Amino acid sequence: MKYPRTLIAAAAAAAFVPVPAAASSNPPTSITLVVYDSFPPEGTSLNAALDRFTDETGIDVEVVVAGDAGTMVSKAVLTAGNPEGDVMFGVDNTYLSRVIDEDVFERYEASGLDAIAPELLELVAGGEATPVDFGDVCVNYDIEWFEAEGIVLPTDLASLADPTYRDLLVVENPASSSPGLAFLMASIAEFGDGWVDYWTELVDNGVDVADGWTEAYYDRFSGTGDGDRPLVVSYGSSPPAEVVFAETPIDAATTGVLADTCFRQIEFAGILRGTDSPDEARQLVDFLISAEFQSELALNLFVYPANTGVELPQVFTDFAVVPEDPATLDPEVIATNRAAWIETWTNTVLR
């Protein structure tokens, strides 16, 4: 998931800067972990976990931020077999088939897979990648706004096109945003061949489109900033983030989640084919699904750990939403149609 704005700036400043590991009397072997731009800058407990990995193994981990998930995958495809790193983390199920088809990763069945939720392994049964976390992209709403206006909340994707919610929704462009792409996938999973008609209805109902999540959530959504739109495409785990990062302590979330609008995202890691340090890369992948690393995911990336033995923080239990039946699409179907879907969406919504 994306970071609150105060941390986004720090993360951007840290882009392409190696994260220093703990000092050692002997220079450790160094490997590179390629990540997306939501990975936190140094100084967090997640980075401290990587430092402990260095202490335990003697393997120094340099973190390189390669842009958003789509940009990261595109770079990895272009350098497949001659990678710019050793391990890549942050490939989600909307991009998984592309990574597999382009032979970006070496197959590896990580140590510790018995602790991973079985449903997360279904897409990578042959060791094509390793699931690290999951979450859901969902429509979020401004609780105070709806209470003040006395308007009943929308219940599902179809209701967002109702005139009751005219000019209330902001979404992200799927061509430039991971949650935007996930929301497009949710509409395709829900409406099938009728998804274009659905988006035409949303356009007629005044849907607003931002380039990315940060702009949508902080600039246009009324629940977190100066925006005037009380509905936004974000994450099922956004409400606990609002509690954790509130400038003034609060004991209840100010935003809510429409559980019947969600699309499931699973994030994977893999060993980049052509790495010069395959043994060290395997050790790092093993560590990424260990309880030691997984226990830091919730309050750093605001995602759910893939390791079923990890206990969630209370703020997640209290305020995050895990839908009972989130929308999904077969990664092969996504891979075959992604470009055409985005082009059709662009022609329908932006032109």
Which role fits each region the language model picked out?
Residues 1-32:
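Short, low-complexity disordered leader/linker segments with a strong preference
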Residues 26-98, 225, 351:
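Early extracytoplasmic/lumenal segment of secretory-pathway proteins
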Residues 69-105, 114-125, 219-220, 239-247:
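Pocket-flanking alpha-helical
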Residues 83-88, 106-143, 158, 168-174:
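A structural signal for short loop-to-beta-strand junctions that line the ligand-binding cleft
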Residues 93-104, 124-152, 180-191, 266-270:
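Periplasmic solute-binding protein
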Residues 106-114, 129-130, 158, 236, ...:
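Short beta-strand->loop
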Residues 179, 185-260:
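Ligand-binding pocket segment of bilobal, Venus flytrap-like solute-binding proteins
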Residues 263, 269-329:
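Mature extracytoplasmic/periplasmic domains
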